[in-house]
Amino acid sequence: MPHMLYTEIPTQRPVTPLLDAIDHPQQLRQLEHSQLLQVADELRQYILYAAGQSGGHFGANLGVVELTVALHYCFNTPNDRLVWDVGHQAYPHKILTGRREQITTIRAKNGLAAFPAREESVFDTFGVGHSSTAISAGLGMSLARRYQKDPCEVVCIVGDGAMTAGMAFEAMNDAVAHDADLIVVLNDNDMSISCSTGGFAKHLAAIWEKGHLVNVNEHGEAYIQPHPKWTYNSRLHQSATDAADNLFKAIGFDYFGPFDGHDVTQLVQVFNALKKRKGPRLVHVYTKKGKGFAPAEADPITYHAIGKINAASGGKTPPKYSDVFGEWLCDEAAQDERLLAITPAMCEGSGMVKFAKQFPQRFFDVAIAEQHAVTLAAGMACEGLKPVVAIYSTFLQRGYDQLIHDVALQNLDVTFGIDRAGLVGEDGPTHAGAYDYAYMRTVPNMVIMAPKDENECRQMLHTAYAYNGPAAVRYPRGAGVGVEIQKEMTVLELGKAEIVAEIKANSDEQITVLAFGSRVMVALEAAEQFAQKHDVSVCIVNMRFVKPLDEQMIRDLAEHTHLFVTVEEHAIMGGAGSAVNEFMAQEQIVKPIINLGLPDSFLHQATHNQMLQDCGLDAKGILNSIERAWLKVNQVV
């Protein structure tokens, strides 16, 4: 039965009789081998339908349909552990493990998580979202079960993009040291989110160029069995040796493949045979991202994720902050040949496609290697260049030691464009940029800015670039507020806030709102409503800088302020409001103050607006918080 190739996303639920009978992998394992092709086809159709209903990650899931069917068919899940790296590709896994009818709720409020989550299912053995963690986690599980004298098979499914991170090789090295019973499935689709880059990608390409896909059907499972005389003697293993000098063998893994990752019959043979072996084993499978859906096969980057097919679209949308960054980057580079740009595998998401085409010799995609990205920039700065690192807030966490030790300690001239700061909606807690103020503002020499709109974002990026030292601009996901962007770039005064509005009332009482970044314009709306309702003067400040704070403005405003309110789209603990509290305490400025921001909890996915409402950071929530605080200040119960 050939693979079906679809050209449209179905709007009606497809007919899937075999899939509908599977609520547990045990029911899958009761089917005949010959029925697995139909299961895979039904699963692919259902993913197309479900993704169209809910949106979400797309191409990666279509690419692992046969692999997922084979894994759950061969291994005794959940007792045997499947550990998915990143989790973009976990939709087929969720569907086969009792969540078929819930899959259309994925990434929605109170729906299924975007990635595997331990609290959601016993089949989700490890919570993921960030890259390159699966082998470490899987090794930990394998060693724990060995220690408990209750061994099981542990299978880590890792993409070729994730294998570019050092953590993956640290884990493989340790697995060999412990002679752990561990299977790593290398899902090689020549992609991460963007195209894979670097020496490892070239190494995999060499295997393909010099070798060939191994066909177990031609020789049978005997070619995966250990030879009685020596460990690595099998024609199957030898095929990899002939294909290229093999990095995995050099580390100490027993290597098998490469296999066709869409041949479910062959994959079943391979996995059943591998269960009879012990020690660290790596199975190399080749898959196609977007498999079975023609548009996604042709353009896997665009179809990495999709929106709902029936999502309403309105008029003209303001530019995304990532696009504002990309335009600034090109403009700044045109004026200064010292500018080099670095991204850890997020060229498209960070808005750098235009720069990469316009300045290819000055563009460095270092793959999924955030630690390396930061120290690479430090080395460039040591030679008198001015590197710009474009990175998501949640991923900069992985380069924190390098930020401190390699950049800030040496006061090197590195600019950080920190994207996806704050809440990120449907991607949930693994991707939230909720902690960057806290982990950066404690670092000496750092300058931290947050723009209120897209024009200020451009000016802040220029300011950070002009600053002689480490400086960061953090901006949110999605579109700006719709203001005109000035082509001319201006260096802002370091550590200087601006008063956005002063709303005067008849009384002498005043509230001062110190707002940061994305919450400035929303806080202005709430403050205007409060002033109208309560006849109280309100001063709204765009703080601009988290570090250095505009301390003088706070001192001056304190003389007339009866209540301070700080507002930020960041964790309250350790955030910008905490910085204001610390300053006021040291200066002995004794004024009532409330801090509005993200609570001390991991926030589950919903739309961005829903999450803001739940946190009280929309205009209504901010207004309610100010009113409650004002009642306390005036001792009105």
From Swiss-Prot:
Q: Which UniProt keywords apply?
A: Isoprene biosynthesis, Magnesium, Metal-binding, Thiamine biosynthesis, Thiamine pyrophosphate, Transferase
Q: Which reaction does it catalyse?
A: D-glyceraldehyde 3-phosphate + pyruvate + H(+) = 1-deoxy-D-xylulose 5-phosphate + CO2
Subunit details: Homodimer.
Q: Which CDD domains match?
A: TPP_DXS, TPP_PYR_DXS_TK_like
GO MF assignments: 1-deoxy-D-xylulose-5-phosphate synthase activity; magnesium ion binding; thiamine pyrophosphate binding
**Top EC category:** transferase
Q: Which organism is it from?
A: Acinetobacter baumannii (strain AYE)
Q: Give the record's family classification.
A: Belongs to the transketolase family. DXPS subfamily.
**Enzyme Commission code(s) on record:** 2.2.1.7
- Provide the protein name: 1-deoxy-D-xylulose-5-phosphate synthase
Pathway given for this chain reads: Metabolic intermediate biosynthesis; 1-deoxy-D-xylulose 5-phosphate biosynthesis; 1-deoxy-D-xylulose 5-phosphate from D-glyceraldehyde 3-phosphate and pyruvate: step 1/1
Where does the chain bind Mg(2+)?
Answer: 160, 189
